Structures are given as C-alpha cells and as structure tokens.
From Swiss-Prot:
Protein location: Nucleus
Main location: nucleus
Phylogenetic placement of the source organism: Eukaryota, Fungi, Dikarya, Ascomycota, Saccharomycotina
InterPro entries reported in the protein's UniProt record: Mad1
GO biological process, one term: mitotic spindle assembly checkpoint signaling
Entry keywords, A to Z: Cell cycle, Cell division, Coiled coil, Mitosis, Nucleus
Gene Ontology CC annotation, any one: kinetochore
Signal peptide positions (record): none
Function: Central component of the spindle assembly checkpoint.
This protein's name: Spindle assembly checkpoint component MAD1
Coiled coil: 19-283, 322-483
Recorded superkingdom: Eukaryota
Length: 648
C-alpha cells in the first residue's frame, strides 16, 4: 500500500518495468478489495432480506387464517339469512326452534365479536410488521443505492486503471525487448568485461520478480474470494426484489381484508335487522292451514310453478299475437298484390277488347271482300260461259274452287280467332270472379284481424297521408291546362306490332288475290305469292332470332347467377360446389383446396380423401351421419377441423 502514492506522483514514462508491474498489481489489488467489500455488503443485505422473508411468511399465514375465518363467518351468516327467510312464516309450534336459533345467533354473535377482535389484533400486527418490512426495505434500498453509487465510482476507476494497465503493458513489452537486447549484447560481449555490480543488480532484479509473482498469486486468491461474495450479494438482490413483490401482494391482501371487514360489519347490521324482524313478525300472521314449515315450502313451490306456467302462457300468447300481426301484414301485402293483379287484368281486358274490336272490323272487311269476290266470280263465270270452251271452263272452275277453298279457310281461321277471343274473355271473367271471391274472403279475414291488431292507428295515419298526397296530385292535375297534357304510348307496342303485321299480311294477300285473278288466263305463278312467302319467312326469321337472343340472354343470366350462388356458398359456408353427372355434388373446402368430398344424392353415399388429413374423421362420421343423420352438422365439424389445422 505504500507504493501507491509514489506511482501517482511519478508519470508513466519515467517508470521502470518493475515499477509498472508493481503499479498494475496494486491496481488489481484495489479492484479485488472493492469487489470483496461489495460482496460482503451484499451478503449482509441477503441475510437481512432472509429474516424479513421469514417474518413476511409468518404474517401471510396469519392473514390467510384470518381470511378463512372471515369466509366461514360470512358463509354461516348467509346460511342464517336463508334460514331466517324460510322461517319468516313459522307457526306458533316452532317458537322453541326460534328460541334455540336466537341462542345460536347470540353465541355466533359472540364468536363473531371474538373473531373480529382477533382480526383487529392481526391487522395491527400485520400493519406493524408491514411497517417494519417497509422500513427495512427502504433502508435496504438506500444501502443498495449507496453501494450502486460506490460500484459505479469503482467501475469508472477500474476502467481508468485498465486503460493505464494496457498502456503499462505496452511499455513493459518495449522494456522487455530492450532488456532482451541488452542481455544479448551482454552475452555476446566477453565475460571479462562483466562487472560485479551488474551481476548484483541482476540478482536483485530476480528476487524482486519472484516476490512480485508471489504477491500476484495472493491477489488472485483474494479476487476469487471476493467474486464468490459478489455472487452471494447478487442472489440477495434477487431475493430482495421478490420480497418487494410479495410486499405488494401483502398490501393488496390487506386492502381486501379491509373490504371484508366492511362487508362483515354490513352483514352484522343485516343480521340485527333480521333478528328485529323475527321479533316483530309473528307467527300470528300465518294462516291456520300452515302447520309445518314444509307446508309453507310446498305452497311456495306451488306458487312458483303457477308463476312459471303463467309466464309460459303469457310468452305463448305474445308469440301468437306477434304471429297474428305478421299474418296481418302478410295478408295486407297479399291484398295489395291482388289489387295490383286486378288492375293488370283490367288493363289486359281493355287491350283485348280493343284487339277484338279491330279483329271484328277486319272480319267484316274480309266478309265484304269475300262477297265482292264472289260477285266478281259469278260475273266472270257468266262471261266465261259465253266466251270460253269446255276445257277452259274446267280450268276456271278449278281455279274458282281453289279460291273458294281459300276463302273458306280464311273464314274458318276468322271463326277460330273469334272462338279463341271468346274463350280468353271467358277465362278473364272467371279469373276476375275468382279474384273477387278471394278478395272478399281475404277482406273478411283482414277485418277480423284488424279488430284485434294494435297497428290500426299507424295504418290509418299512413292511409290518411297517402290520401292527402293523392288529393294533392288530383288538384295538381286538374290545375294543368289541356294543351300541356300528353298521352304517351310505346313506339314498339306489341298491339301496334301485331296490327302492323296483320295489315301488311292482308295487303299482300289482297295483292296475291288480284294477281291470281289477273293470272287466270296464264298458267304462271304470280310474283305476289313469292313476296308473301318471303314475308312469312322474314317473320319466322325474326321470331327465331328473338327466341335465340332470349335463350342466350337466359343462359348468360343463369351462368352469372349460378357463379354468384357458388361464390356466395363458398364465402358463407366455406365449401365450393361443383355439380357432377348422375346426381353427384363435389364439395371443395376453402381451407384445403386440394381435398374434396363427393356426395352421391341418388345412392346417399359420401366419398372423400379428408380421412388422411383429419384424424377424427371416422368418429365424426359415425356420430353425426350414421347415429344422428345430420349431414350439415358433420360438414360444419369438418370445416372447423380444417380451419384449426390451417392455423399456424
């Protein structure tokens, strides 16, 4: 220790190799002594924490026992409450039981007071022990903070010394190199030149080096001892942190004990109030039919059953009422739909009447044309009889017969059209009668339901608002000028289309008729026949084109809707559906796209390769499909298992 001031006074450059080594050893010794001091302080703190831990464990055991006692008292108090509730209506014969219960209550009260006193004592003890523990912990904290500051200072000093040691080691290496060079020079020189003084110096140096080595070994032993003490101090620090946590838990348990004490006081007050009620309420209030407490219990059970039954009936009536209201709403919707259908039928009847009127006009025109044609034919026959030969007469008679056949065909077709129109009129009238009858029956049923319905006011208010809106619209329409009113009609109206086609066909037939009349003298077929056939072909092509267009559109819509349906099923149910041939359906899970389930709806069989993925496949199949016959539940279980397997 006497070497340290000399080392501090001299600079590092002026020191020899021996002095540098001595300085390094002294610094190492200081470092080890500091470490040993820290380990010793840590050991002392560990001992203190161990003693505090023992005290803490004892206090915790006492507190747990107190808590158990309070819980037992609380449960006994609850039992007493229940007994008091059940014995509020006891008969006169049970006064002895009440007296015994009162004595038990008094004894329990005394026990509770004793327990309360014990709890108060334990609380005082715990608070005193807690104060001791907190004081000890605070002192330990202060000691730890002081030791931490000292450690920090020592670490800074040690870092400085380590840097100095490194610098000194470098200088030592240089000095050793110089010494080795000098020794080599000395050995190379002659032994005669060696002086006795140099030999003495070398011997002294050898002795000092041996002493320094022994001193270094002693310092290393001291360092090891201090390291063990440091480990013990660190263990004590960990124990101290555990003690802090346990102290926090103890504080929370103390808070719980305070809350339990408050609960206990409230329960005691309730117990006193219940005793007062027992004294005030008498057995006089009970009916004579209650001879035993069991009678009261049975009566209470009966009343509870009646109450539950009445609640069930009330809920059923409420459900029936809700169903009736829903049925009423549905019937109102059906009535509105029937009214809309009635309006549609009336409009269709008006359209059919218009068509009928037009067809009758066309029929009259065709009859008149037939009459004119017959007159012309008769005149023509008279002229031909006068002019032509018997062969020509035969040809003319054949042509006339053909025309007659055509006219008869036209008349038959007109009759058929009239019959169809009459049939459609009869059907419409029948449907109208049926709808009227249905409307009458529905209206009667609605009237009966509306009388029992509470939503009449809402419907009335809605209808009043609707009526006001309609009246306002009527006023707006009447205020408009006649010039501004325009009747709109569809340009491509089907009625007009049919009328146009019939008109065009009639014109072609008239032209064909006139051409045939003019071409009687010749054997050639007139062009108008070709035009009519061409027109019929165009009409057929248009019909075929529209039918093909409709079918393609229906196919597109069907494909689109089927894809939407499959996507919706896949997103909502987790299975992608693929419809196979022969009534088979392939189910592919979204969690395992490579696996599948094929369900044969005709033979009621399942085929899948999921049994290798799901280990519980056989048990699930046996439980849900074979035993319970619930395929949807089986599929949902499979989906859940696949989802669990897909989770990381």
């Amino acid at each position: 220790m006497s070497l340290t001031p000399q080392i501090k006074e001299k600079p590092l450059e002026s020191l020899d190799a021996d002095q540098l080594r001595r300085r390094v050893l002294t610094l190492q010794y200081k470092y080890t002594t500091l470490q040993n001091e820290y380990e010793i302080s840590k050991l002392s703190s560990e001992r203190e924490t161990y003693s505090l831990q023992n005290k803490y464990d004892k206090s915790m055991n006492e507190l747990e026992n107190a808590l158990k006692d309070t819980k037992i008292l609380y449960e006994e108090n609850i039992k007493l409450k229940e007994e008091l509730k059940s014995k509020d209506a006891l008969p006169k014969e049970d006064e002895k039981i009440i007296t015994t219960l009162r004595t038990q209550v008094v004894s329990l009260k005394n026990e509770v007071n004793l327990k309360e006193q014990r709890i108060v004592e334990l609380a005082h003890k715990l608070s005193s022990k807690q104060n001791e523990v907190t004081n000890a912990i605070e002192s330990m904290k202060l000691e730890i903070e002081g030791s931490g500051n000292i450690l920090h200072q020592h670490e800074t000093q040690i870092n400085k010394h380590v840097e100095e040691i490194r610098y000194l080691q470098q200088e030592l290496k240089e000095k050793e190199n110089l010494i080795s060079e000098l020794r080599s020079v000395q050995t190379s020189a002659s032994h005669r030149n060696n002086s006795t003084e140099e030999l003495q110096d070398l011997a002294v140096l050898n002795k000092t080096l041996k002493e320094q080595l022994n001193y270094a070994k002693e310092l290393e032993d001291m360092n090891l001892k201090q390291a063990t003490e440091l480990k013990k101090l660190r263990q004590n620090n960990d124990v101290q942190s555990l003690l802090k946590k346990e102290n926090e838990l103890l504080q929370s348990k103390l808070d719980q004990l305070n809350s339990l004490q408050k609960k206990f006081e409230s329960l005691e007050m309730e117990n006193i109030s219940l005793q007062e009620k027992i004294t005030q309420w008498g057995i006089v209030r009970l009916d004579g039919k209650f001879k035993n407490p069991n009678d009261v219990i049975t009566e209470l059970n009966m009343l509870q059953r009646e109450n539950t039954f009445l609640l069930d009936t009330n809920s059923k009536l409420q459900i029936d009422f809700n169903q009736m209201s829903m049925l009423n709403d549905e019937m109102a919707i059906e009535r509105n739909q029937l009214l809309d259908l009635n309006k549609d039928y009336e409009t269709s009847i008006l359209n059919l009447k218009r068509l009928n009127h037009e067809l009758e006009q066309q029929k009259l025109l065709s009859f008149e044309e037939c009459k004119l044609l017959r007159q012309q034919l008769e005149e023509f026959e008279e002229q031909d009889d006068k002019k032509k030969t018997p062969g020509d007469q035969v040809n003319a008679s054949n042509i006339i017969e053909g025309y007659k056949n055509q006219t008869e065909d036209l008349t038959n077709e007109l009759k058929r059209l009239n019959e169809e129109l009459s049939k459609t009129d009869d059907k419409i009238q029948k449907r109208r009668k049926i709808t009227n009858d249905l409307g009458i029956s529905y209206s009667q049923r609605l009237n009966e339901l509306i009388l029992e319905n509470k939503k009449l006011e809402r419907l009335l208010s809605a209808t009043k608002n609707h009526a006001n809106i309609l009246e306002q619209k009527i006023l707006d329409l009447t205020s408009l000028k006649e010039k501004k009113v325009r009747i709109l009609q569809l340009r491509d109206n089907p009625l007009l289309k049919e009328h146009y086609i019939r008109k065009e066909k009639l014109a072609l037939l008239e032209k064909e008729n006139s051409d045939l009349l003019s071409g009687i003298e010749t054997d050639a077929i007139p062009r108008s026949v070709y035009d009519r056939i061409k027109h019929d072909m165009k009409l057929l092509e248009k019909e075929i084109f529209s039918a093909n267009k409709k079918t393609t559109r229906l196919k597109e819509v069907f494909n689109k809707k089927s894809l939407e349906f499959i996507e919706a099923v896949n997103s909502l149910l987790g299975f992608k559906l693929e419809f196979l041939a022969h009534g088979k359906v392939k189910l592919v899970s979204c969690y395992q796209p490579n696996k599948y389930i094929i369900a044969d709806l005709q033979s009621n069989t399942l085929k899948s390769d999921l049994d290798k993925v799901i280990p519980e496949w056989e048990t699930l199949f046996q439980l849900y499909v074979i035993e319970k016959g619930e395929l949807p539940a089986f599929l949902s279980q499979v989906k859940l298992r696949l989802w669990e397997l897909s989770q990381p």
